[in-house]
């Protein structure tokens, strides 16, 4: 039974194709599926390791959300579509040496690609990290401009 007819109005809205939100269609016309893959399932699907998947999520290559966004240890959830997008992601990823032998992939998304729920400016974060990195490794950093 619907209280005050509110829900049935929403149902009617969901049935109208011109209202993109209720049909889960993004501005770019992609159909968004509900978050349905666990991190392990995504790893199987992508044929990558768990640490790689987490790195992809942190660097913005793989879109994911936490099951409970309020808990930092909550398990990640993603979609097949996000996994496919991560695989098709242009491979102009920059190798950034972290100074202690760890090399991480960092990729900057253009603002046109930022989907709902992504960190506001991933590129700005990377720039901040890179400038911190430069301070840390000043003196032993090789300048690629000089031979």
UniProtKB/Swiss-Prot annotation:
The gene is xis. The keyword Transcription regulation does not apply. Excisionase and integrase are necessary for the excision of prophage from the host genome by site-specific recombination. It holds the Pfam family HTH_17. GO terms for molecular function: DNA binding. One of its GO terms (biological process) is DNA recombination. It comes from the Viruses. Transmembrane segments: none annotated. This is Excisionase. Keywords: DNA recombination, DNA-binding, Viral genome excision. The keyword Repeat does not apply.
């Amino acid at each position: 039974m619907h209280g005050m007819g509110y829900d049935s109005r929403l149902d009617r809205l969901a049935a109208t194709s011109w209202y993109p939100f209720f049909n889960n269609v993004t501005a770019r016309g992609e159909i968004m599926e509900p978050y349905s893959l666990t991190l392990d399932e995504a790893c199987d699907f992508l044929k990558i390791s768990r640490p790689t998947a987490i790195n992809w999520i942190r660097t913005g290559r793989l879109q994911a959300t936490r099951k409970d966004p309020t808990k930092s240890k909550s398990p990640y959830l993603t979609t097949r579509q996000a996994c496919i997008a991560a695989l098709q992601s242009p491979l102009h990823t920059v190798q950034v040496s972290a100074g202690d032998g760890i090399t991480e992939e960092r990729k900057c998304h253009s603002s046109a690609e930022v989907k709902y729920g992504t960190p506001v400016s991933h590129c700005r974060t990377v720039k901040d990290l890179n400038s911190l990195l430069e301070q840390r490794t000043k003196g032993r950093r090789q300048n690629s401009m000089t031979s």
